[in-house]
Design a protein with these regions (language model features):
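Catalytic machinery of carbohydrate-active enzymes
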Residues: 1-354
Length: 354
């Protein structure tokens, strides 16, 4: 059996931005337990820069697609080749699908080294983050009875990445260039992947859509309550048309609103969230980022999604979080029934809580 100092934990997780933020405590727990940064198998072009700010995470290997047939996907071949050269060590698979296990087994990873979600369901009321931490406390069969890999029950890792001075400086320079450096900042996140996934964003299947007119009314209310504030519409470049439609719906004071959908790579967004007064968002990764970075958050949530506040407020955190649901108890109800006045009231409550 390898000596304790030679073991490097390997984690497999193919998650969206928010999912990967909520994985950070697991990475920290495993790195502390085994004494080395984790290796990570994942996906997403933003995963590598995010994990560069997590000292508990070492090398990251990315798949372009895990669902594609193996013989048609070079990144899967390369992963399997790498696994075949990989020394034995603990492997934690925070994925429910069979493809992850198939790739591991094809790469020669023996089952005795693997801890996974197979037979390890979430407990009632358990958040994704705490589910991952519980998996991190499991011990691979290959290490049963071994000394040196005990779980530290006093260690309670948070989900916060460690931003550098360069990250903060980049954000401050961007704010100065936009004329935003001296104003309170309220961040708005109207879009997510589901909203922007082709077709008409008002389609009935898009339950995460909150109408442009609602956003415009919200912005008007925010301006009335905090006249000095500058409002920044966040998102990806694909979400710019939605942001432009929202601004076009404003009756006045459009100069106080900045569309930043082309200007916010992951690390700048996280740095911005450490500086902002607050954020209002639909259910999407940047909302996780706000709670993680200590930015007070109002998030609009459909009822079929996870209800645990811990999902949006990774512990420990200094961020007050208000989660708003549709008025209807129908699990398929969309967000449109949440009135702008309700969101404004929740936002004002944040200011009191903060």
């Amino acid at each position: 059996m390898p000596a304790p100092e030679t073991l490097t934990p390997l984690v497999v997780r193919f998650g969206a931005f928010g999912d990967m933020l909520l994985l950070i405590p697991m990475l920290k727990a495993l790195a502390r337990r085994y004494g080395r940064p984790c290796e990570l198998v994942s996906s997403g072009r933003w995963t590598a820069p995010l994990m560069q700010r997590v000292p508990a995470c070492g090398p990251v290997r990315l798949l372009t697609s895990r669902r594609a047939p193996y013989w048609f996907n070079r990144s899967q071949w390369e992963l399997v080749d790498w696994l075949r050269q990989h020394p034995p060590g603990p492997v934690y698979v925070f994925e429910p699908d069979e493809k992850s296990h198939w790739l591991l087994h094809r790469g020669g990873i023996k089952q005795e080294w693997i801890c996974s979600l197979r037979g390890f369901p979430r407990q009632t009321g358990e958040s994704i983050m705490h589910h991952a931490l519980r998996l991190a406390r499991e011990t691979p069969a290959a290490l049963n009875g071994s000394a040196g890999y005990a779980v530290d029950p006093s260690f309670h890792p948070d989900a916060r990445p460690t931003l550098t001075e360069a990250d903060q400086r980049d954000c401050h320079e961007w704010l100065s260039a936009k004329g935003l450096a001296d104003s309170p900042l309220v961040l708005l996140q109207p879009g997510n992947k589901k909203t922007m996934k082709g077709g008409n964003r008002t389609r009935s299947s898009n339950v995460d859509y909150w109408p442009e007119s609602h956003w415009a009314m919200l912005i008007t209310g925010l301006r009335e309550r905090m006249p000095a504030a500058r409002l920044i519409i966040c998102g990806s470049p694909a979400e710019r048309p939605l942001a432009e439609d929202i601004v076009a719906s404003l009756p006045s004071a459009r100069e106080r609103v900045v569309i930043a959908t082309d200007d916010l790579p992951i690390l700048r967004l996280l740095a911005l969230q450490t500086l902002a007064h607050s954020m209002i968002s639909v259910n999407t990764g940047p909302a996780h980022g706000a709670a993680t970075m200590g930015c007070p958050l109002v998030v609009l949530f459909t009822r079929h999604q996870h209800r645990s506040a811990d999902l949006y407020a990774p512990q420990p955190t200094t961020a007050p979080v208000e989660i708003l649901f549709p008025a209807s108890i129908d699990p398929e109800a969309d967000l449109s029934s949440i009135a702008p006045e309700t969101v404004l009231a929740a936002w004002q409550k944040l200011s009191v809580a903060g």
